[in-house]
A protein has these predicted regions:
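Structured core of small recognition/catalytic domains
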Residues: 179-205
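Conserved short beta-strand edge segments in small beta-sheet-based binding/regulatory domains
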Residues: 112-122, 158-160, 195-205
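AMP-binding/adenylate-forming catalytic core of the ANL superfamily
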Residues: 1-115, 124-132, 137-185, 189
Length: 205
């Protein structure tokens, strides 16, 4: 059993702690109190920027018109004022791409002003599922991690901390922030700094 093409079967089957085998399709689901699993579909990809609902395909299709881009993925970056702003990750066919040139290209080719990415990241490869689809949660985790790290460093410049973004069954992507050798006051400072963001997080010491 599996996919027709053998290369798509790599890491397709996974086993849990009970020895049961599962098919890793990339879909999301929740388990109820009776042990039943409910498929909830794939993660909602719509980027909500203030009052604008942005369809990532608008960005991705425009960026893939560039002759040196083989793949593009648009995700939301947490933003204090707009909730989210769009950013775009692109897979390069060579090493000639320039960020500023791509931002200008995006401005010229994306018809919706609110959908123009605030930043563009050039990667040799984008994370993909076993069937070749871009695995956007990995990119969203990166954006959440970068935003939280930047905010904590702004208020606790000399403190040590770690940020891990995980998939939570209740909250979706959840940032778990661990402060090292910090006081409760420091934890309150971090919580106050992040409190106005729409992202989900926990702070522990």
């Amino acid at each position: 059993m599996g996919y027709q093409h053998e290369k798509q079967n790599k890491d397709l089957w996974v086993s849990d702690e009970h020895g049961d085998t599962w098919l890793n399709t990339g879909d999301m689901a929740r388990k109820d109190e009776e042990g039943y699993f409910w498929l909830t579909g794939r993660k909602k990809e719509l980027i909500v920027r203030g009052g604008h609902n942005i369809e990532p395909k608008i960005i991705e299709e425009a960026m893939c018109k560039h002759e040196d881009i083989s793949l593009a993925a648009a995700v939301g970056r947490p933003d204090l004022h707009a909730g989210e702003v769009p950013v775009c990750y692109v897979q390069s066919l060579n090493n000639k791409l320039d960020r500023e040139d791509l931002l200008a290209f995006a401005t010229a080719h994306i018809p919706e002003k609110a959908a123009i990415p605030k930043d563009i990241y050039i990667l040799p490869e984008l994370p993909v599922t076993v069937v070749g689809k871009v695995f956007k949660p990995e990119l969203e985790k990166r954006e959440i991690n970068k935003k939280i790290t930047k905010e904590i460093e702004a208020v606790l410049s000399n403190s040590q901390f770690t940020v891990e973004v995980v998939q939570n069954p209740m909250h979706g992507l959840l940032a778990e922030i661990q402060l090292h050798n910090c006081t409760s006051k420091a934890a309150e400072t971090v919580d106050h700094r992040l409190g106005d963001y729409t992202l989900k997080y926990t702070v522990s010491q």
